[in-house]
Amino acid sequence: MPVSLARNAGMLSVAVLCGGSSPEREVSLAGGKRVADALGRLGYNATVLDLNRESVGQLLAMAPDLVYNALHGVQGEDGCVSGLLDILGLACTHSHVAASSVGMDKVLTKHVLKSLGIDFPKFDVLTKEELLSAKEVLPYPFVIKPVRGGSTIGVHAIFSKSEYLDLSAHADTLEDRMIVEEYVSGQEVQTAVFLGRAIGTMELLFEGRIYSYDAKYVEGLCEHIFPANLPYDIYNLTLEWALKLHQCLGCKTLSRVDFRYDVANKALKLLEINTHPGMTVSSTLPEVLWLRCGLNFDHVVDLIVQDALGIDDSRRAYIDELMGKTVSREPSHV
């Protein structure tokens, strides 16, 4: 059985908040269950709560030592729940209000990137009505995304005028505000940031124009390559940019930063940051931590919990030594 870093894990209660009403509900439920199972193996007293109108009363009655925020999407990872938990006086995992809110908003994130000198795709912001009227925007191809959303839900890659006109058939997937950005062909890569360090970058191989919902969550539709097959300087740039954005936003404990590398033009573009990375069996951040640092899923969950509770100095020294030994080594082929 895994052993928690917490000396008193068996006395600590953790409420795992997941589900909710966002389009990413199923992903959140899957990740939340996996986290709760890990907490149980570690000896914590874990309870799963599906976010709804009764959740505030349930949390106040439980008075858990910690709330593990396993929510995704609007109202889950956009700072709403973090702010609510702050008001209730309950400690929680993951980034707090400001970092979560800005990180969830793709437009605000791009303005932060500009201030940091980090390259990103050209973009514009349109309303749903403007998109459905086929207003001329960027040159083809381009990608349409909800300003606030994840799991590639409501994302469309548009390569021609006819595809743009066909968007009306998918009107139900469009939000009131949508971001339109240039399509960057090339390698899709993701960088894991954990406990103040950029850990490593993974490459994703899949069929199609974009890293779709099915490619993310259906077994066998995406191949994970670690470390990413990038030029040495580009690989290191993913680490540098990911950590810089994580720190600038004030992210807590962990984040995942997504990139596209345009091989033909040797250009790296930062797409977005996820302050609440997935924890399903196909999620990349736990996999990178295993392949790069030897941290299994239970250990990762334990570290997230302990970082939220405040790791004591002796345990922090152990973690720093562990992470330092693994992260200081460059991947062999980059």
From Swiss-Prot:
Presence of the UniProt keyword ATP-binding in the record:
yes
Q: Can the keyword Protein transport be found in this entry's annotation? A: no
Q: Name one Pfam family in it.
A: Dala_Dala_lig_C
**Which residues are listed for Mg(2+) 2 binding in this entry?**
E272, N274
Q: Which domain of life is it from?
A: Bacteria
Catalytic activity reported: 2 D-alanine + ATP = D-alanyl-D-alanine + ADP + phosphate + H(+)
Cofactor comment text:
Binds 2 magnesium or manganese ions per subunit.
Q: Which PANTHER family match?
A: D-ALANINE--D-ALANINE LIGASE, D-ALANINE--D-ALANINE LIGASE B
Question: What is the name of the protein in this document?
Answer: D-alanine--D-alanine ligase
The taxonomy runs: Bacteria, Pseudomonadati, Pseudomonadota, Alphaproteobacteria, Rickettsiales
The gene from which this protein is expressed is ddl
